[in-house]
């Protein structure tokens, strides 16, 4: 994603990313929502594995640890979260990002989303969390995720929503697109998936974010990064408010939001 930057700038960029992802309200709230979705997916996977092992006899009783792959793992914040659900590992194109993963003791290797360095049907669960929108060929990346996911396994996808919400952060992050729910669902189906659930997320801050981006476009104000906009006094509160959406999302699909979350299954 930052391959064209000088080495010192890449290291600085990923150092900022590592710090921001650990504490910024948006990432904290997103992880709370993702954990809720992951718990549901993992429960289904573990129930299926227990049933299969029970049929195989006492020698295979119990639930084996799930293998999980985080595509585009970056500096490892999501990989740390995923590790509580099984044997998680990551893949990323950036050596600098991978170095942060290794410093945290996380398993990660270099590779492209469009040509993942894994055998067919290796993982019970694969994730791409704000990654697919970076790809020149998003369907190719999703097909690779489908390939390395075991039959009966799941992929959890999180992407930004609506091109008319395009902002400075999209430019900084080298995004190619912001999706509608229909668009990302269509691409996942083209890759071979069955969609179990698709919903918008971050309804809580939809209006303020839309208003802020319209204001910046009208005034020409361009912050170095939207993550640098100072909300330090409210950071903890914002994280809790965003994360609280997980309660509503247990039973409701939001009709609109800043992001989209999709649970896709390999049948």
Q: How would you describe each model-predicted region?
A:
Residues 205-239:
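C-terminal helical/coil "lid" or tail adjacent to the Rossmann-like core of SAM-dependent
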Residues 213-217, 255-267:
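Core SAM-dependent methyltransferase catalytic element
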Residues 129-132, 158:
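Residues lining the SAM
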Residues 139-154:
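A short glycine-rich, Lys/Arg-flanked "PGG" loop and its adjoining helix->strand segment in the class I
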Residues 48-60:
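Short Gly/Ser/Thr- and charged-rich N-terminal loops/segments
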Residues 1-47, 65-121, 125-129, 142, ...:
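Conserved N-terminal segment of class I S-adenosyl-L-methionine
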Residues 193-203:
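Conserved S-adenosyl-L-methionine
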Residues 15-19, 155-177, 181-189:
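Short, glycine-/aromatic-enriched active-site segment of Class I SAM-dependent methyltransferases
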